């Protein structure tokens, strides 16, 4: 029988961070993470512990940081060999959007375009109030809101310009090739879909989803601006198997704001995987998972692992809520 996403999605998915250093707090903690998880053994022992104890079955992998991501994949493979059990893989894959022969997936103008759309959607005051309370966003801005890209300091893409967006499929093939030897269960094209949805390029979205479906049975998508993007994708009948999006009670990285994301998540019929439930380590314990599983009625959640002690505490909290 062919597997469907509903039949294979577990309640808990083991996320990549902080094994690539990312703490969502500050550079000093990032450095400590890099030192703490500097080799495959330091990572695989955590996986071995939690899989044996809690029977977790799915892990996220990535390609954006080749050296550390390759080490992470090796740690998963070593774990599989030790425990004699297959770990299902959910692979993040960046979608390389091009404009004027340059990759713009995370360009300043792309950020400005998203800022402009978010602001127009909920209003300037609400949006600014959300942004300046978002500690993960501040971390992404290297701790300084002066680095924030807005539609005031950077020109958003116009509708006419967006008509010239393309997808670089040769580069996309390279990204997929990074996972050679991995048996990927779920492909997760990145939140570049936000830019394409907001600029109305649903033709490109359908095009690359069809491309990925030829290679992977299950294709979901990351979404960072779920309050706008999810309704747009559904209005335009985008054939996607589910969404992976930030969901935490503090509303961090939930754009345009927490309320719009909650509405979108509650009103889709597609499976949703919540991520960043702990708000980058700022909202811990059972309360984090009560928000995801009880309030939002989401059935699957991706969380950051960390050390054995950290992972143990997080999983216990989640299971207390799930039970």
Language-model segments: residues:
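Active-site mouth loops of central-metabolism enzymes
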Residues: 24-42, 93-96, 119, 148-171, ...
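Glycine-rich, aromatic-flanked loop segments that form ligand/cofactor-binding clefts
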Residues: 8-9, 15, 84-137
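Beta/alpha (TIM)-barrel catalytic core signal, keyed to glycine-rich beta->alpha loops juxtaposed to Asp/Glu
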Residues: 67-69, 95-99, 160-170, 176-183, ...
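N-terminal small/glycine-rich loop or linker at the start of catalytic domains
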Residues: 5-34, 101-105, 130, 135-161
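Short, aromatic/basic amphipathic alpha-helical patches
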Residues: 74-79, 104-108, 316-318
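N-terminal binding-site loop/beta-alpha segment at the start of enzyme catalytic domains
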Residues: 1-84, 291, 295
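Structural recognition of the beta-strand scaffold that forms the well-ordered cores
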Residues: 13, 60, 90-91, 242-244, ...
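Hydrophobic alpha-helical segments and helix pairs
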Residues: 109-191
């Amino acid at each position: 029988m062919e597997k469907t996403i509903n039949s294979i999605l577990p309640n808990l998915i083991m996320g990549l961070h902080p094994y690539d250093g990312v703490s969502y707090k500050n550079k000093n903690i990032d450095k400590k993470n890099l030192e703490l998880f500097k080799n495959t053994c330091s990572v695989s022992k955590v996986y071995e512990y939690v899989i044996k104890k809690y029977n977790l079955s799915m892990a996220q992998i990535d390609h954006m940081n080749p050296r550390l991501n390759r080490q992470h994949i090796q740690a998963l493979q070593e774990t599989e060999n030790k425990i004699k059990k297959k770990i299902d893989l959910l692979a993040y894959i960046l979608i390389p959007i091009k404009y004027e022969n340059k990759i713009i997936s995370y360009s300043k103008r792309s950020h400005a375009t998203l800022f402009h759309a978010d602001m127009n959607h909920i209003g300037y005051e609400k949006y600014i109030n959300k942004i300046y309370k978002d500690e993960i966003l501040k971390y992404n801005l290297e701790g300084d809101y002066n680095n924030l890209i807005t539609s005031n300091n950077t020109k958003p893409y116009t509708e006419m310009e967006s008509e010239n967006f393309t997808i670089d499929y040769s580069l996309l093939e390279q990204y997929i090739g990074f996972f050679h030897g991995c048996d990927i269960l779920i492909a997760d094209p990145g939140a570049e879909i936000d830019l394409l949805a907001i600029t109305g390029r649903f033709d490109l979205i359908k095009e690359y989803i069809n491309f990925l479906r030829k290679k992977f049975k299950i294709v979901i998508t990351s979404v960072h601006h779920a309050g706008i993007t999810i309704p747009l994708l559904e209005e335009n009948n985008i054939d996607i198997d589910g969404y992976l999006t930030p969901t935490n009670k503090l509303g961090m990285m939930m754009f345009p704001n927490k309320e719009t994301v909650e509405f979108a998540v509650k009103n889709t019929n597609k499976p949703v995987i919540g991520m960043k439930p702990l708000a980058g380590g700022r909202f811990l314990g059972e309360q984090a998972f009560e928000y995801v599983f009880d309030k939002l009625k989401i059935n699957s959640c991706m969380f950051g692992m960390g050390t054995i002690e950290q992972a143990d505490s997080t999983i216990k909290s989640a299971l207390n809520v799930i039970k």
